[in-house]
Amino acid sequence: MSSTRTFPGESSAVSSADSSLSASAQPREITIAHSPDSDDAFMFYGLATNKVRVPGLRFTHTLSDIETLNRKAMDGNGAYDVTAISFHAYPYIQEHYALLPSGGSVGEGYGPMIVAKRAFSEESIQRKRIAIPGKLTTAYLVLNLFAPGIETDVVPFDQIIPELLEGKHEAGLIIHEGQLTYTRSGLYRVLDLGAWWHKTTGLPLPLGGNAIRRSLGPELMAKVGAALRESIQYALDHREEALNYAMQFARDLDSRSADKFVGMYVNQRTLDYGTDGREAVRRLLEMGHEAGIIPHAAQVDFVG
């Protein structure tokens, strides 16, 4: 079940130096959507709480699970000006969206995991039926690269571990905070797909990023992209403050675990993918297309 929340970020203050905006001018609304997870909350902290303001713009934030955001981005011209997406979804929305150069969640030799109630070999994964968090998630794409044609059942990401414990599935593909909490439930890690990806390609695993609507135009796209980067930098520079805010979204994590999770997915690479990070996005989508998982080739386009 998806969970959607909306709250305003009134980033509309006009600086005294900006004489181009009159006192009566209405700020331009920019709609932003991201997942209700501690890492996303951390990176958007600056914008969501007005620590980062952009003259002439007002940001409103919608929170929803990543598979729902993937689907909404595919709806017509897309539901939001800026949206978090799984990289697997990008080829389906590339006509209307470009990728922002910051805001990515990238695993450095780690990533989504296959877990189960009992241990079994990596080689036997192909013969299992796996609970997955959505068919547009990057986790699902990488699972199919590892085990082509594997049988799966779509389950809301936050229900995968409970359903494994109830015996409804042989194994589950976990994302988000589940990567740190699965052992509390007595589950075994069968495979870390981020580690497999790094061993196979030598690259980090790009899981998700932020896409921006092309119809905003180059100037506004760049301005919004700079605001997001400033928000991430603010959170990194004011870590304790931003972590305290992010804790309200940290499902089942104590402050120490939330700090660890945020550190895994919000770091210097979140500010800038780097050459190898951008190459990893291209390689991932190329491999998905070549394997027949993605029906058409991706034209990876970063703003700047």
Question: Model regions: which residues?
Answer:
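Bilobed "Venus flytrap"/periplasmic-binding protein-like clamshell domains
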Residues: A25, E29-T49, P112-A171, I175-E177, ...
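Secondary-structure end/capping motifs
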Residues: G217-M287
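Beta->alpha turn/N-cap motifs
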Residues: D65-E67, D75-P91, P156-F157, I174-L180
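A structural signal for short loop-to-beta-strand junctions that line the ligand-binding cleft
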Residues: I30-T31, H96-G104, R129
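A local structural motif
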Residues: V52-L63, F146-Q159, I294-V300
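Pocket-lining segment of extracytoplasmic ligand-binding domains
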Residues: D158-Q248
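Hydrophobic residues within well-ordered alpha-helices
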Residues: K72-G76, L164-L165, V224, G288
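Hydrophobic/proline-rich hinge and linker segments of small-molecule sensing/allosteric domains
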Residues: L99-E122, L145, H198-S215
